[in-house]
Regions:
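C-terminal substrate-recognition "lid" of short-chain dehydrogenase/reductases
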Residues: 124, 217-246, 251
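Conserved glycine-rich cofactor-binding loop
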Residues: 23-24
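Residue(s) in the substrate-gating loop at a strand-loop-helix junction
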Residues: 147
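Alpha-helical segment proximal to the catalytic Tyr-Lys
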Residues: 132, 176-180, 237
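Substrate-binding pocket helix/loop in short-chain dehydrogenase/reductase
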Residues: 103-104, 108-116, 198, 209
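Active-site loop immediately N-terminal to the catalytic Tyr-X3-Lys motif
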Residues: 105, 152-158, 180-181, 216, ...
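Active-site helix of classical SDR
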Residues: 127, 163, 171
Length: 252
């Protein structure tokens, strides 16, 4: 099902945060930001991630579980493994997603199904299992990574936009469900970022996207990571059920 690589001891910690999709540019930045803020992080991705790839010279600890989050039936055991090996999580960042694009009338059904499974079903099911630990502790944080595409139309991203809109609806309703137990649930909606997901768009498209932003550039990955770290903090204890946008003003 999955394999484990760890530099952390198997002790429960109230500041343990699980981050999915840490093999990507945004997920790695989120993990690094949390570690620098003093959290212990367990990353999940299909590709193994060495601690040095995430932490650099920071003072925190990073552990990794290699798993396919698209395997919905295996998520229950994955959650059990995380709790058994690393302790009860304080926070969860649902970052892993796939960005399949294309005009909807010509997309294969299998591509649509995979996108919905990875971007919607998987984070909902993982949240189901890991928030059980937060409920018993009566404290916790859930941050879902959405996208400006959830609110602003982009050509060729109908299915992707639907998946991100679903996560924002999930965020608002889950905040109502578990808020009385001291758990906040929020979403962060990045605009286009300078990561591997935009590297193949071509110069003309990249220029057009940047001109659309009020600041005339892409949003910075580190800025998104900082927003996630803020939402994990005690300073954000009264922020729940909302989506915070980091897009250099592209939706202004």
């Amino acid at each position: 099902m999955s394999t484990r690589d760890s530099t952390a001891s198997n002790t429960a910690s109230n500041d343990l945060v699980v981050v999915t999709g840490t093999s990507g540019g945004l997920g790695g930045a989120i993990a690094t930001g949390l570690i620098e803020a003093g959290y212990d992080v367990v990353g999940i991705s299909r590709r193994p991630v060495e601690p040095a790839e995430v932490t650099g010279a920071s003072s925190g600890r990073y552990s990794h579980v290699t798993a396919d989050l698209g395997d919905i039936d295996a998520i229950d055991q994955l959650a059990r493994q995380i709790v058994s090996d690393f302790g009860k999580p304080f926070g969860l960042v649902n970052n892993a997603a796939i960005g399949t694009d294309g005009m909807l009338p010509t997309m294969h059904n299998s591509d649509i199904e995979e996108l919905v499974r990875v971007n919607v079903t998987s984070p909902i099911v993982l949240t189901k299992y890991l928030t059980r630990q937060m409920l018993s502790a009566r404290r916790g944080r859930v941050v879902n990574i959405s996208s400006v595409v959830a609110k602003t139309g982009y050509r060729g991203l109908a299915a992707y936009g639907a998946s991100k809109s679903a996560m924002e609806g999930f965020t608002r309703s889950l905040a109502r469900d578990i808020g009385p137990r001291g758990i906040t649930v929020n979403a962060v909606a990045p605009g286009f970022l300078a990561t591997e997901m935009t590297s193949g768009l071509g110069d003309a498209n990249l220029d057009r996207i940047q001109k659309r932003a009020a600041l005339g550039r892409f949003a910075d990955v580190a800025a998104v990571a900082s927003m996630v770290t803020y939402l994990m903090s005690e300073a954000a204890r009264d922020v729940t059920g909302t989506t915070l946008t980091v897009d250099a003003g592209s939706t202004a």
